[in-house]
Each structure stands twice: as C-alpha cells, then as structure tokens.
Amino acid sequence: MARLCFLEKIKLNTIEFNMNEISIVTAFFDIGRGDWTPQKGLPHYLQRTTDTYFDRFANMAKLDNTIIVYTSEDLAEKVWSIRKNKEHKTVVITVDFEDQFIEQRDSIRKVQNNPEYLAKINPSQVKNPEYWSADYVLVNMLKSHFVNHAIGAGVVDTDLVAWLDFGYCREASTLNDVELWQYPFDKDRIHFFNIKNFNPETSITSIIANNDVHVTGPCIVASQKMWPELERLVEESFKELISKDLIDDDQTLLLMSSLKEPEKFELHPISADDWFIAFRKYNENLS
C-alpha cells in the first residue's frame, strides 16, 4: 500500500515540549451509523447518530490539552463551537473522506464482498461492521496515519501524542475530572491497552472470524518518533491481510503490529469490561 498523503502541510510556531503532557489526535466522519438500525437487520448497539458522537466529544473537549480533529468540512464549525475558549489549543483539519483513499477502500470492499471470506466468519458475528462496512474498516485503519500527518504538519506541541476515538468519553465521568492529561509514558515504546494475551496457537484467521479482541483501539499513545513505526506496521499488516483475502478493523491490525516487532510495544492490561480507563489509571493530573 502506498504511503497515504492527502493534505498540504500546516506549520505552526514551534512550542517547547511539556514533558508528560499529551496532545490528542482524533477524527470523525459520518459513515452512516445513524442508519445502522434494527429495522435493517442490524444489532441495536451499532446505531450511533452524529449527535451522539458530538455529545461524547464534548466531554473530551473540556480538556486543556491540544486536540487535533480530522473531519469533513460541514462538521468543522461544530468542532470549533464545542472547543470555544480553547481555540488556541485546537486544530481542525478538513478531509473529503469519501473521495480519498480510493485504493484502500476498494481493496477492503473487494474482500468484504468475497463469499469465501464471509463463509469464514462466525455467523453470530457477521453483522458487525468490520465484515461489511468498508468505510468503518478504513477510518479505523487510518488512526496512525492521521496522527503522523498531524506530527508532520507541525500542529502537535508535545512529544507524547495519543490517538483517542472521537467518542472515547461516552460519559462525563470517563474524564475523571481531569483538566490537563499528563502521564510519563515510556517514549521508546508504543502503548497499547490489551484485554487478552495472544495465544500463539490461535490463528489470525480465527481471531478475525470470531471477533476475538486482544488489543483495544480507542486509545493509543506514543512519542512522535514512534508513531511512524506504528503506521508502517499497520500498513504491512493491512497488506498481509488483503493478500490473504482477509480484512478486519484496527484491533486485529494493532495486534498483528505488536506481534511483528514486540520490542517496540508496551501492552497495558485492562479489563474487558472497562476499556475507557486512560484518565483514571494513566493520568498524573487529577483536579
């Protein structure tokens, strides 16, 4: 897969790094989840409207950290409105998501439409979007790309950078009353949060077929120098799956990345029932 480039670089004034402060990169594109309804034969928990996502983002937006948001032009003003009075710590970069990443989207869709691929999937899992929504798989695959673009564009003002899903703070309590997120993550490692250790006897095909989550995707932390390493490994893992007529969302791509070069990663064990713990367990600034 060719390295993804889609935006002109943006250069801001260089700001001296603040030791353990963490810049946040996130993204939101409307891929139609508001229409993923039981009436269409889909599980009720898949449906999330644009308003649902922005309500959740409003919780995270209370942070004083720099937040860089990739979104569509029609939603940019909504982001600015939510970050009112924090504009100096906010960057919004607009992307025409539907018209970008055509090659990658087509590769994903080709696998998802392959009857041989679908036949491998556990029937109890087949309605989950990673098995049928190319946009869902694509936007999750691009997490490390968006972070690296932000770093290259000069809009990240700390050494530590986190990807946080746009809806990470599902409840206000997820933020844990934190105002400025800081934590001394090891800057020589890529930090994942895993709910299950990998068993070498388990095949990647089985993991995909059964939606067998090991590494979670909503929060990833690394220093600026380590994010290109993650993007490289994710791209390699994506190419590997496509070559085998397989596809999955970021959780399997992250697992595969950590297995390729484990020395570059630190896995932080978390409960399968409690994914959203960054501000409670990995934070040194409780207000």
Residue map of PLM features:
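N-proximal low-complexity "stem/linker" segments adjacent to membrane-targeting elements
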Residues: 17-51
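Short, acidic, metal-binding catalytic loop of nucleotide-sugar glycosyltransferases
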Residues: 55-64
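Short, aromatic/basic amphipathic alpha-helical patches
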Residues: 76-88, 106-108
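Active-site-proximal specificity loops/subdomain of glycosyltransferases
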Residues: 90-150
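GT-A fold catalytic core of metal-dependent nucleotide-sugar glycosyltransferases
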Residues: 135, 139-193
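Catalytic core and acceptor-binding pocket of nucleotide-sugar-dependent glycosyltransferases
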Residues: 168-170, 192, 212-287
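Short beta-strand-to-loop element that shapes/binds the nucleotide-sugar donor at the catalytic cleft/hinge
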Residues: 192-200
